[in-house]
């Protein structure tokens, strides 16, 4: 299954635990979506990122091939939040070459608006660097850091 990862799931340490059989395919962005911190994490003690529809915006990430077992592990790792807090959804991403591709991603069922913390953003930025995402993506995430 081709799965679009973004935010903290791009961090290589986290990705290795949550989808151990993953294979990197390419970087891409999800058009007409933006990041919203709409779930609270007791582990991170801050808001967690999810994607929401947002015309004209984009969310950068990477597409990986993952197994059914990876998907089960990934879902189990979301145990920091109640069951059903996240859902899988089909989305069309655009590669750096402009190719459109239907993949799966996950999104939170929002419960409110929360703020991220610096340590969470730094964790995300490690993944952005690892997968060589765009400078636009890096700057977007740096802008989420608390002042």
Locate each region found by the language model.
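Glycine-aromatic micro-motifs
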Residues: 1-147
């Amino acid at each position: 299954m081709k799965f679009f990862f973004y935010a903290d799931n791009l961090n290589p340490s986290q990705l290795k635990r949550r989808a151990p059989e993953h294979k990197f395919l390419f970087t891409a962005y999800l058009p007409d979506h933006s990041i919203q911190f709409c779930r609270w994490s007791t582990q991170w003690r801050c808001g967690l990122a999810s994607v929401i529809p947002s015309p004209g915006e984009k969310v950068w990430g990477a597409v990986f091939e993952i197994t059914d077992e990876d998907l089960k592990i990934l879902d189990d790792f979301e145990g920091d939040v109640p069951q059903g807090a996240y859902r899988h959804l089909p989305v069309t991403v655009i590669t750096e070459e402009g190719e459109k591709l239907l993949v799966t991603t996950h999104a939170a069922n929002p419960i409110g608006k929360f703020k991220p913390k610096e340590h969470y953003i730094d964790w995300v930025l490690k993944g952005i660097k690892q997968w060589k995402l765009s400078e636009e993506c890096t700057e977007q995430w740096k802008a989420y850091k608390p002042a």
